[in-house]
Amino acid sequence: MANTNTLETTARVGYAARGIVYMLVGGLALMAAVGAGGDTGGSRDALASLLDEPYGKVLLAVIALGLLAFAVWREVAAVSDADHRGSSGKGLAIRGAHVISGFAYLSLAVYAAGLAFGWATGGGSGGGSGDEGAQGWSAWLLAQPFGRWLLGLVGLVVAGVGIGFLGRAWKGDVTKHLRYAPEQRGWVVPLGRAGFAARGVVFLIIGGFLVLAGWQAQSSEARGLGGALRTLQEQPYGWVLLGLVAAGLFAFGAFGVVQAVYRHIDAPDVDDAAGEAKRAAQRGARKIG
């Protein structure tokens, strides 16, 4: 029971940390949209902005721990199937995506810790660190056999995830894992729908640029979160588009804090999770052999 409670606490801390990062990204982008300063950067730019705030390094250290917790929970939940996705093609795809996102949040946690303890330096305004990361791995993928097709396929998958988010925002159950009072539904559901809609738009833009990068065999066409936001800003009435999506990202961040409090966490026992991970590794080794 103690091990289960430890994992549940880890998950809740992680959801809160992810929510804070999204609120930072959305808040800064919203400020940029209305001309009140801000920035249209990605997650790393948002974290770097805390260096200019009082006790910013302390905040970064706390967020780094939270992101590490979320990375751990993503891997544990994917391996143990804590969300009961099952072993169907769709279920395995979602669990696989969670494994990948776990490593992404681990990288973000290391970056936040680097800012807090001086291992890393923050980018400038609109530094595009997210774009540089996307362009870096896109260049690596393009250098592989059939790289253009692989990058295009990744772009289509990302865009497909975006469409899925939009569908969930439109008529899906965004609160199926939450346990909250009926009177809270009036604000929890709209918050979740706005958040998933904004993520859907961002993923569609990122996926589209990845397809373009693959089609043209130019990694410089790839965009990350910051690049997607700047693309919106550069359109006619861009401040409106950016403002809407930025508000949605902030809403998704707030929804993350709601998840930290109200989400049903079916955390496995630590020993059971370790055993399942070992069995999964053994099954994978047998398939390779």
Label every model-predicted segment.
Residues 41-51, 137-140, 184, 219-241:
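Short, membrane-exposed interhelical loops at transmembrane-helix boundaries
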Residues 96-115, 186-208, 280-289:
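Hydrophobic alpha-helical transmembrane segments of integral membrane proteins
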Residues 174-190, 274-275:
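Juxtamembrane inter-helical linkers in multi-pass membrane proteins
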Residues 34-45, 121-135, 174-178, 217-226:
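Peri-membrane helix termini and adjoining interfacial loops of integral membrane proteins
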Residues 1-68, 90:
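An N-terminus-focused feature that recognizes amino-terminal "leader" regions
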Residues 2-5, 9, 16-28, 61, ...:
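C-terminal functional regions that serve as terminal interaction/effector modules
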Residues 5-6, 28, 54-173, 248-251, ...:
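Hydrophobic, ordered structural segments
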Residues 1-8, 144, 182-185:
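Short, charged/polar, low-complexity loop and linker segments
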